[in-house]
Amino acid sequence: EYVGTIVEKGESVATLDVGDFVIGSFMLSDGTCEICEAGYPSRCANAGTYTGSQAQYMRVELADGSLVKVPGGQPDDPDKLADYLAASDVLGTGWYAAVAANAGPGKTIAVVGDGAVGLCAVLAAKTLGADKVIIFSRHGDRAALAREFGADIVIAERGEDGAAKVKELTNGYGAHGVCEAVGTQESMDQALASVRPGGYVG
């Protein structure tokens, strides 16, 4: 994941210019294949992962589909660069989870995981209009940040007890959608146990 300023561009680059401040992830995408057009650029049929962003300069293939131009250019304050860096991975991943969980008005969304991706999923679910956001968290500082980002309820319980708590808060049904933001079998089990029949797990 990286941010940077374009210092040179190839002839095939059509949407970016020298001097543009851009955000990139560790994935390349052409932005034109059927998978990209469906909204899944990290699974591009014609690209994949790459490395090299720790270097001072790097060449980014498929730049039009892989880089996002930041309006307004590079911030004057160097300390703000880290804010943009979050958009290269954790914010997009959390946003994707909330979209895949079908977050929106009238929905209750649960978030499994209180790390950076989970916290961004809370922020995304609220931004997408979810009525209620529940997060599983046992860490006081992260729970406080989750509330600041829009979480309405924090659940410390895990496993069957955690799923029972979600169901108790949703008239016995379970959440309309669950954002799984850990990546373990246990966290996926928690997500599946907490979602209602016909619900979504992102």
Language-model segments: residues:
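Glycine-rich beta-strand-centered segment in the early N-terminal region that forms part
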Residues: 1-37, 71-77
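Buried hydrophobic positions in well-ordered alpha/beta secondary-structure cores of metabolic enzymes
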Residues: 4-6, 19, 33, 58, ...
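NAD(P)H dinucleotide-binding glycine-rich loop of Rossmann-like/cofactor-binding domains
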Residues: 30-112
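Glycine-centered, small-residue-biased loops immediately flanking beta-strands
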Residues: 107, 199-200
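Adenosine-nucleotide cofactor-binding segment
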Residues: 111-114, 126-190
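N-terminal Rossmann-fold NAD(P) dinucleotide-binding loop
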Residues: 118-119
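Helix-to-beta-strand junctions that scaffold the AdoMet/dcAdoMet cofactor pocket
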Residues: 195-197
